[in-house]
């Protein structure tokens, strides 16, 4: 398996957008696959914020994860964010998500970022086992979500 910037593997853009849409469209009323693809293209990155990483094996897309500047507009002091962590269902529990999250953390460290934030309704326990701490819980897009933080100096 390889992990690299989506910007270097544009052929995964449409499939990534389809998968993100299928996973999260319930939280984004009015969203479309095309709009997702446009956002992913803008976030494709290549050593910058925002950046999207893809995990792949040959022609098979395994997953993706991103580093974005801000996820919660009403909390501009919380930045940057690990976002859009997605692993193909048939490939879960094989370390792909962990590898993608590590790629984002390493990108942040290269940019001298000392902490990362994440908002999730489903992955709080997963991240807690890896050093992330709950900062707050909030209702967002119809779900109770945890805003979590990772100190990259200690991690």
Please report, for each region that a protein language model flagged, where it lies by residue.
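A short beta-loop-alpha structural element at the N-terminal edge
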Residues: 1-16
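Active-site rim helix/loop that mediates acceptor-substrate recognition in acyltransferases
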Residues: 25-54, 62
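Short coil/loop residues immediately preceding or within conserved phosphate-binding loops
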Residues: 50, 77, 82, 143
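Conserved beta-strand in the GNAT
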Residues: 52-54, 60-70, 81, 86
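Conserved acetyl-CoA-binding loop-helix of GNAT-fold acetyltransferases
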Residues: 84-87, 93-106, 129
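Conserved GNAT acetyl-CoA-binding A-motif
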Residues: 101, 108-121
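C-terminal "cap" of GNAT-fold acetyltransferases
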Residues: 118-123, 136-155
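Conserved acetyl-CoA-binding loop of GNAT-fold acetyltransferases
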Residues: 128-138
